[in-house]
């Protein structure tokens, strides 16, 4: 049986004020005298009071909650994006309502329907591919939406990210410039950004008069996936002398396999990844990677979303934060 929670009246009785005074303090402490603030705060702590958001939600007032839909909770990329988001939402008194959907648009639809039922004030997304019902629900909700991770694909409202195509093209060009000619693209998940990077890789190969070659798997990205992908690439493409991977997990796995086989990196095999994870930056040789502003992207995305919630105009609609090529020692 649930224990009865302290209510506003309990706090008011403890301090000797009206329930409305406590309510004003919870909404905005500045509306209450300095002398009362300390007393109310102490009473809240002593009683273990937990605010009830249901009345605000039912009255269509602000919930001070931001919905965040992520395709994965195990991917370090999104952990860092979330850290950036919450550095801003926490500072402004907003709660993040988090859900993940395993890169499945139908599951994203279910998660979104649940989130919207809580009257969230805004929504943060990281993918551009959605079901028709998801798009309709977002339209009907009429709340501000920010999409992260990509600054080029069409967005629903506003976006903060970087150019995945150009990042992949430039990294592939850097590998080619170091004398490698038989370069394969290793991809996992087959999500939209993986495909965009593949196109950037292919453009660089074609621009150099080289033949593009991709090895892709649908399962999630991991070190073991990187091992399996480079094994497959070497079987199917014996002259292989370089790989560009959709992220650092695959690249690190490929490096482990080269080490096992006694292949020298980069002399026998060039290896490059994406996102600049810490493990790749402490390897020897240091992994070449595209460094992306993940935490900054989350914080700026959250700042722009809160501005939209306040009714402010946000420009540009799509903000490109750029990327940095880090050649390391592996290409």
Curated annotation (Swiss-Prot):
Keyword Kinase attached: no
Gene Ontology terms: biological process: DNA damage response; negative regulation of DNA-templated transcription; positive regulation of DNA-templated transcription; regulation of DNA-templated transcription
PROSITE patterns xref list: HTH_LACI_1, HTH_LACI_2
InterPro entries: Cro/C1-type_HTH, HTH_LacI, Lambda_DNA-bd_dom_sf, Peripla_BP/Lac1_sug-bd_dom, Peripla_BP_I
Start and end residues of each HTH lacI-type domain: 6-60
Keyword terms: DNA-binding, Repressor, Transcription, Transcription regulation
UniProt protein name: HTH-type transcriptional regulator GntR
Gene: gntR
């Amino acid at each position: 049986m649930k224990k009865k929670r302290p209510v506003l009246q309990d706090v008011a009785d403890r301090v000797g004020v009206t329930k409305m005074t406590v309510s004003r303090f919870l909404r905005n402490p500045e509306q209450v005298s300095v002398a009362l603030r300390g007393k109310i705060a102490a009473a809240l702590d002593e009683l273990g009071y937990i605010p009830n958001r249901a009345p605000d939600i039912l009255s269509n007032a602000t919930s001070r909650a931001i919905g965040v839909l992520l395709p994965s909770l195990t991917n370090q990329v999104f952990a860092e994006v979330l850290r950036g988001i919450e550095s801003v939402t926490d500072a402004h008194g907003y709660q993040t309502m988090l859900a993940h959907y395993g890169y499945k648009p139908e599951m994203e639809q279910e998660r979104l329907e649940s989130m919207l039922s809580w009257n969230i004030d805004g929504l943060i997304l990281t993918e551009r591919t959605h079901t028709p019902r998801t798009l309709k629900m977002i339209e009907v909700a009429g709340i501000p939406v920010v999409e992260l991770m990509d600054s080029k694909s069409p967005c629903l409202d506003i976006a903060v990210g970087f150019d995945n195509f150009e990042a992949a093209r430039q990294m592939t060009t850097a590998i080619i410039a170091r004398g490698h000619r038989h370069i394969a693209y290793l991809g996992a998940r087959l999500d939209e950004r993986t495909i965009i990077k593949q196109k950037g890789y292919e453009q660089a190969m074609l621009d150099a008069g080289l033949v593009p070659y991709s090895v892709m798997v649908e399962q999630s990205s991991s070190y073991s996936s990187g091992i399996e992908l480079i094994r497959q690439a070497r079987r199917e493409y014996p002259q292989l002398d370089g790989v560009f991977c959709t992220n650092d997990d695959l690249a690190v796995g490929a490096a482990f396999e080269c080490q096992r086989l006694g292949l020298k990196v980069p002399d026998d095999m060039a290896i490059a990844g994406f996102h600049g994870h810490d493990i790749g930056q402490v390897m020897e040789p240091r992994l070449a990677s595209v460094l992306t502003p993940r935490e900054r992207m989350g914080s700026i995305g959250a700042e722009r979303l809160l501005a939209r919630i306040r009714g402010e105009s946000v420009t540009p609609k799509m903000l490109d934060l750029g990327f940095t090529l880090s050649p390391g020692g592996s290409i």
